[in-house]
A protein has these predicted regions:
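Accessory helical-bundle/CTD segments and flexible terminal tails appended to RecA-like ATPase motors
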Residues: 1-189
Length: 189
């Protein structure tokens, strides 16, 4: 993880010019996503995202299941994980389902170049690549963000604070809505 972050930082800072040329060549060959610029997308939330003690009584077992979920990346893996939980413990409560949706949210955020996503107070804030000179800001991933903002100007806005660029999207009260919003962003051209 540390090595990946260091390589990403070098690509975006020290060798940004060289990588920008590489990105131009790559753009002709394939779609450039935010994953080319972000090593990981962290999620912070004020929502209740957990497996309640009533659902999984053993705290050590809950911790193991949280760790396993944190390691998942594909929707198919999350579905298999959910099925295993239901086989063992019964129907997954709503806060557990929301927790499992974080896997998709993190993947979509990374694809769009978000280093962090906050879900707080009914709003979703995506924090983009830290380096303002990064070729990310000329990529298709960021272009999709701009297109989404143009389509929904009353719903979202772009801001820059202390050199950090972010987009705030209003009326996103759940992880499910956040995932649906980012899925829509990824489909825009």
């Amino acid at each position: 993880k540390i090595l990946t972050e260091a390589v990403t930082e070098l690509k975006n800072d020290e060798f940004a010019d060289l990588y920008a040329q590489d990105a131009e060549v790559k753009a002709e060959e394939e779609v450039i996503t935010g994953e080319d610029f972000v090593a990981e997308c962290n999620i912070e939330s004020d929502l209740e995202l957990l497996f309640p003690a009533e659902y999984i009584p053993s705290s050590s077992e809950r911790m193991l299941l949280y760790r396993e979920l944190d390691g998942l990346e594909l929707d198919e893996d999350v579905l298999a994980y959910k099925n295993r939980l239901e086989d063992r413990f019964g129907k997954v409560p709503s806060e557990g389902l929301e927790l499992m949706r974080v896997v998709s949210l993190r993947r979509l955020g990374k694809r769009l170049g978000a280093e962090r996503i906050f879900l707080k107070g009914g709003r979703m804030t995506l924090f983009f690549v830290s380096n303002p000179d990064s070729p990310y800001y000329q990529s298709q991933a960021f272009g999709r963000i701009i297109n989404f903002m143009a389509r929904y100007p009353r719903l979202c806005n772009l801001r820059e604070q202390n050199g950090k660029r972010s987009m705030v999207v209003k009326d996103v009260p759940t992880v499910e809505m956040a995932v649906a919003t980012l899925q829509e962003v990824t489909t825009l051209n």
